[in-house]
Curated annotation (Swiss-Prot):
Free-text note on domains in this protein's UniProt record: Capsid protein p27: Proton-driven dimerization of the C-terminus facilitates capsid assembly.
Species whose genome carries this gene: Rous sarcoma virus subgroup C (strain Prague) (RSV-Pr-C)
Lineage, broadest ranks: Viruses, Riboviria, Pararnavirae, Artverviricota, Revtraviricetes
InterPro entries associated with the record: Aspartic_peptidase_AS (IPR001969), Gag_M (IPR004028), Matrix_HIV/RSV_N (IPR012344), Peptidase_A2_cat (IPR001995), Peptidase_aspartic_dom_sf (IPR021109), Primate_lentivir_Gag_pol-like (IPR050195), Retropepsin-like_cat_dom (IPR034170), Retropepsins (IPR018061)
Protein name: Gag polyprotein
A single Gene Ontology CC term: host cell nucleoplasm
Annotated motif Nuclear/nucleolar localization signal, positions: 524-527
One term of GO molecular function: nucleic acid binding
Motif (LYPX(n)L motif): 180-184
Gene this chain is encoded by: gag
Superkingdom: Viruses
Bias (Basic and acidic residues) ranges: 128-141
Motif (PPXY motif) on chain: 172-175
Annotated positions for site Involved in capsid protein dimerization upon acidification: 418, 430
Amino acid sequence: MEAVIKVISSACKTYCGKTSPSKKEIGAMLSLLQKEGLLMSPSDLYSPGSWDPITAALSQRAMILGKSGELKTWGLVLGALKAAREEQVTSEQAKFWLGLGGGRVSPPGPECIEKPATERRIDKGEEVGETTVQRDAKMAPEETATPKTVGTSCYHCGTAIGCNCATASAPPPPYVGSGLYPSLAGVGEQQGQGGDTPPGAEQSRAEPGHAGQAPGPALTDWARVREELASTGPPVVAMPVVIKTEGPAWTPLEPKLITRLADTVRTKGLRSPITMAEVEALMSSPLLPHDVTNLMRVILGPAPYALWMDAWGVQLQTVIAAATRDPRHPANGQGRGERTNLNRLKGLADGMVGNPQGQAALLRPGELVAITASALQAFREVARLAEPAGPWADIMQGPSESFVDFANRLIKAVEGSDLPPSARAPVIIDCFRQKSQPDIQQLIRTAPSTLTTPGEIIKYVLDRQKTAPLTDQGIAAAMSSAIQPLIMAVVNRERDGQTGSGGRARGLCYTCGSPGHYQAQCPKKRKSGNSRERCQLCNGMGHNAKQCRKRDGNQGQRPGKGLSSGPWPGPEPPAVSLAMTMEHKDRPLVRVILTNTGSHPVKQRSVYITALLDSGADITIISEEDWPTDWPVMEAANPQIHGIGGGIPMRKSRDMIELGVINRDGSLERPLLLFPAVAMVRGSILGRDCLQGLGLRLTNL
């Protein structure tokens, strides 16, 4: 094969130039053609009659497997062979120019029967015949200056006409001193001794025939035999079906690879890219029906396996239909032998049932390729049916979710859907514009029109987020990480100190101002008919905050004693700690972040709301529209809120809530811990308990 590769490579370099294939590519192509049965020997490639079948077979293989490397190499080789043929560069002339010419030799004499076969070996690529003129020119006597052809002069006496020698009609013995037979050791030794070979010995080695006698058989071409043995040896590839010296053989799959694939399917699922990559790698080489069915039975459950069997049968029926229309289909063995059928492809024919060795021996290479490709396509269909992807239209970016995480969920859902590949990118970009947070939507709206792919949109948003101010999710994450140690310290201190029933930390009492209990548990609470109650504004007795005469002067602040429900004492004297421009002149609205500090698992740990600063409300009330549905609440001691419109049912948060006010520049005020009330009101209200805890006073600055 090496000699054929060298000849073809030289021709390709001559006629193809820089695009000529390498010797490695030519050797791989020749090995494939021999394996498919398209060439009995590499030298058969010189025959123009084999060119069209080779082109058809490689084209069909490229369409089935999607691999066009061998087809491209064959196209270059075919062009070189056709160019050489058009220039009428025959094989005899090429061998003559390269010094590789040979000739027929009669059967050896008795003296040569005992010689080893290596002495009779000839180089690969030699022709068994040669023209009479060339042969006689080589066998001219050494003392003659000009070669003499047979029929014009006698070999012994040199007479041109009228020779009566008995050997006049016989051709001379072959010239054994040429370099055409480098392995003939006996001839080389005789030449090394410096003596001419006797004519008798020459005749005994290769006795010439007489006139009219048929030429003897050629010597065995051991170079060609060596090529045949090398071509039938096991290839250096990892295939379940290998070709050995004694014929095709079946080798089992690696158990570790199957175990790892089964674990990947169980942990990652059928639609995972890792699973698909491992399945494609394991089925990259032809598999027997025995291996295919057992592999799918291991990695698939009962229901997916039943779906796969049906899908595999449909794919095999497609192969059979194509093979029926084309007699030279690869599954039909290029027209040699019987046509393929469903029983053969499923391994149910005679001699194949439950017998992998029989399947390896009886199935053609084209059938093995079709079986494996159909099984892989059926597996892809089952993966889409057994594990459908979630609806991409319902995916939205959460309040505290980063844009990258949102993009990951969206792209995974879109790629797992049934959308055509050409429509996936526009759908992803449209979801970025509609399903992301408002600040991200604003960035995407201001993006240049040249950004047309999801990757460009993601990169643009990430670059802008690096230079833009903190977003809501960034503020929530930063505040949560900074306040969490302080929250735990406060909770631990309250547990170690003053606790009420149930072990829950208590704030300040609204009646007596003492810590450790609520107003409902206050021992000094006003009895029915008792007019001695404490004012929450001036700390006086006998009246309440609504009746206090100092209400207009201090806006409900008590001099000398803070009423914060959190761990921070109230400022003395009260001062403005929050300076901001309200969104409305007549209604002081602020942006607030609420963080649940409890251990109860919730979907969203932080939410953003808009609340009204109301110094006339005793407590902070969160509207049920703003309150997350999965945040736990409990019944309050006072089940109603009394206002101008009457009583409103009220509940209370079971977990401690961290409340922070966000300024216009994105900065945060000092957070506050409290248990807010939850009621069906039109908007959330920050009452006096929150204002006092923040040290806030509303004025007309």
